[in-house]
Amino acid sequence: MFTRWSPELKDWLNRPGTKALQLGDLNYHVTVGPHQEALLSIASDIDNIIENGNVQKRSKKSTAALCTVDGIEFFAKHVRFTEKKFLFRLRYFVSPSRSYWTAVVADHLERAGLHTPKVLAAGDRRQFGLVSDSYIITEILHGADTADKTLRSQPNSTQLLSEAGVLLKRLHD
């Protein structure tokens, strides 16, 4: 089990050039690159940036959107942990929030040779050590198709969907 103090997370947070920002209860880290200044500038308004982007998914618990700030395009996701059950939130008392966990896992996948969108920034809000909000910002993968579009274009999409479900279950277990 990874904790908020795991060496893998510390390595990601302390990469050369990564900038950390603390704004009230928001803890926010932006990796080095041409995106850094633009993504640092949106920290105080991150909720509005995501909500007003090109929304790809919106639910009570999360919003995912394609966004552009100062000519920098990115994918951003906001997970609202306050909409989740308390016991679910409690596990993140010692574990990193999903945004930081995603950054660490993406790094592992990239080193293993599995291309995954590069994490540009990650952040979370905590109240009394419990995650209330989690933010992940990645590069946009141009030309990527949604799973829905890909499945609908396949002649045996029912079987493909079933197999995809089995694979997803294995990945999440």
Predicted segments with their positions:
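Juxta-kinase regulatory segment immediately upstream of eukaryotic protein kinase catalytic domains
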Residues: 2-54
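Conserved ATP-binding subdomain of kinase catalytic cores across diverse folds
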Residues: 38-146, 155, 163-173
